[in-house]
């Protein structure tokens, strides 16, 4: 099964300890760890700063499973939870893949940190989970909430720590097995 992981900087593997936007090495990025744990090839389509696309995406031809985790940057850019959820609904409806082959993940909620100084941001990020769960149920798309995995975030309140990547990959692998 060819897995495509589509997301933001946490999917990309951004290392917040590097001022210039460095990346964790492959041994510490959840996408690469997942590939190793499942013994399945994965394609990392994570991108720093990515918000939910307003149109569909061109998936690699060999894509069999699509894992989506987005919404954090939309919240950080000032969108309220209802707007983000509506964007996700529109995006999901544009994807040309059987819905059962998609996994929608609500990202871990933001925490107070160098990039997050507002309770409103944190609350908006928390509200994504229930909205995404509803969208997934309406479309018969598998869903999980990464908040239940207690993924450690770095000092910025946004990005996974190295340990966070390991926990995320392990929990996701258990879900996919």
Cite the ranges covered by each PLM segment.
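Alpha-helical cap/lid subdomain in secreted, periplasmic
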Residues: 37, 56-177
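Short glycine-rich, polar/acidic loop-and-turn segments at beta strand-coil junctions
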Residues: 46-51, 72
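Residue-level detector of flexible, active-site-proximal loop/helix-junction positions
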Residues: 10, 49-51, 109, 150
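Serine-esterase "nucleophile elbow" of acetyl-processing enzymes
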Residues: 1-46, 56-62, 166
